Regions:
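Class I SAM-dependent methyltransferase Rossmann-like catalytic core
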Residues: 12-17, 21-41
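Conserved alpha-helix/loop element of class I SAM-dependent methyltransferases that forms part
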Residues: 37-55
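Class I SAM-dependent methyltransferase SAM/SAH-binding core
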Residues: 60, 65-116, 120-134
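A conserved beta-strand element that flanks and buttresses the S-adenosyl-L-methionine
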Residues: 144
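A short glycine-rich, Lys/Arg-flanked "PGG" loop and its adjoining helix->strand segment in the class I
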Residues: 158-170
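Conserved class I S-adenosyl-L-methionine
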Residues: 175-201
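Short alpha-helix
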Residues: 218-235
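Core SAM-dependent methyltransferase catalytic element
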Residues: 235-257
């Protein structure tokens, strides 16, 4: 795993953060060292997907990047009841060409081992290079968006949640993980400070933290948990709860009635 040092040197002109080839090369290390609970969120997203998958449906990984969630869901389903995932497909969608290409390589490398180790054939993963707002969604039992909505234009988020809700079958779920902010300024500052302490503990310097924060400004725009929950309920979900939180990173599950 290549170490993330993209912001280790002083940069005179810091561009907005992009998911390009440079980011792809260090992305696994970046996530591990800069997203509290990332590995747990991916693993438990797969557990949740395994619970709610319905036969002959689609599972979606929206903003799939290197396919961690899609692969985890596939592996969880391969270990479960074959009848539950019969006729299912996992669709991984990302608009970054470099991410899709790297994801395709990772899936092909991992596929043989998965096929040999499990008791029944794995659910196929289908990759799509596309914008989330433009790609059709249908016949879904599970939709996962792990740290993706925060990069969508705020004015387009409600419509996207409605599209997802409409694509889900009754009893289907959305797993939504996001960096969040808090309405109380003192609480918000506490979580930001602790998040930066977490990054320092994982080897990032103050320069790296500062420069990446500048690069993400106006690119990653977080919402509050209350805003997320209100939007999901308005979109047509019947139930919504936070199932994971560490500092200013959280994951919710929304269930369609």
């Amino acid at each position: 795993m290549q170490k993330d040092s993209l912001f280790a040197r002083p940069l005179g002109d810091i561009e907005g953060f992009r998911f390009n080839e440079a980011v792809v090369g260090v992305f696994p290390d970046m996530l591990k060292r800069s997203v509290p609970g990332y590995e747990s969120i991916i693993a438990q997203s797969a557990l949740l997907a395994n619970r709610y998958t319905q036969p002959n449906t689609r599972l979606y990984d929206l903003g799939s990047s290197l396919g961690a969630t899609a692969i985890a869901m596939r592996d969880a389903l391969a270990q479960g009841d074959a009848s539950q995932s019969q006729g299912c497909e996992i669709h991984a969608i990302d608009n970054a060409p470099a991410m899709i290409e790297a994801c395709r390589s990772l899936i092909s490398i991992d596929h043989a081992g998965t096929q040999n180790a499990k008791s029944h054939p794995p659910v196929p993963i289908v990759l799509h290079e596309a914008n989330l707002q433009d790609h059709p969604l249908s016949q879904a039992s599970v939709v996962a968006m792990n740290f993706t909505l925060q990069f969508v234009e705020p004015s387009a988020r409600a419509a996207l949640m409605s599209t997802i809700a409409e694509a889900l079958l009754p009893g289907g779920v959305l797993i939504l993980s996001e960096k969040v902010r808090f309405q109380d300024p003192t609480v918000n500052e506490l979580h930001i400070d602790m998040y930066h302490a977490f990054k320092r503990q994982n080897g990032y310097s103050d320069l790296e933290i500062s420069q990446k924060r500048t690069a993400l400004e106006n690119v990653l725009v977080p919402d509050t948990l209350e805003e997320h929950q209100e939007r999901l309920l308005k979109a047509g979900f019947k139930h919504c709860t936070v199932w994971f939180q560490c500092f200013n990173f959280a994951s919710l599950i929304a269930i369609k009635g």
